Amino acid sequence: IYGMGKSAGNAPIELVAMHLNDCFGKDYHISQILEAIDANIMDFYKPATWGYNMFFFIAALNNCHPNYVSDLMNKRTLSVKAINQILGKLEGDKKLLYDKNYLENLYLEYQNVDVDDTADMAELTEAFAGRNVLLLGPGMNVEKQKDRIESYVKENDPIIVSINFVSELFKPDYIFLSNAKRYVQLATELLQKGDEFKVIATSNVTKTSGKFDYTLKYATLLDEDAEIIDNSFIMLLKVMIRLGVK
């Protein structure tokens, strides 16, 4: 994929697949190949780039203005499949005449999957009642503050909730998932360690098979006044407030 190999000149599988789809009536799922590129190659591609830019490939694949692709990728909340599905909703002249507000409405419409979370909220409220809670975000700060966190855990015996990642230093009781892109990256680990914790997902994240332990309505957790209305940490704080956590 992406022209990788032991030497230069390898044909990118995704470009071959697109050509076969367009010219020979094949039905290869290119989004799955792009997902593999995004999840496994982009981290080491950026310091030493080669070949074509996936960003422009996605724009060409959807015949749309490249700024649409840039805006969606910069959100860092969407899988490549989701990006292609949103771009597929662009209509008429809007495809090539960039309209940021139009795209934002399509994004929110796509993310806003409606669910009834009454039962799940009731069960979580009971589980969190009277308990201290420790929220862990991704990044280096958890490791830097390891001693302080260990001390807090020892003294308070909190429920530990990891936000869009699985902590290796502190065993979480729950994983809060609001980011579809992170879910794609974590899917294998969640499958392997599924018995060690429960997953609380927002309704914009779709499980590959079956259901998450808890699914909460995405729209009710948005912060309409914030620059990033679906910030994962803010969404989880709203969940904690609804659960009565103090």
Can you describe what each PLM-predicted range is?
Residues I1, L134-N141, N164, S232, ...:
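Glycine-rich anion-binding loop/nest that anchors nucleotide
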Residues I1-A122:
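Catalytic cores and adjacent flexible loops of soluble metabolic enzymes
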Residues G5-S7, A11, G139-N141, V166:
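Gly/Ser/Thr-rich beta-alpha loop segments that engage phosphate groups in nucleotides
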Residues M18, D22, E150-Y152, L177:
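Alpha-helix termini
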Residues L20, L72, L134-L136, I175, ...:
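Generic structural hydrophobic/aromatic packing signal, biased to beta-strands
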Residues K26-S31, K144, Q192-D195:
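Short, mixed-charge, low-aromatic patches
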Residues K94-D157, E168-P172, V184-T188, Q192-K193:
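N-terminal donor/sugar-recognition subdomains of glycan-related enzymes
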Residues Y152-I159, F165-G244:
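Acidic/Gly/His-enriched mid-domain segments of enzyme catalytic cores or analogous surface patches
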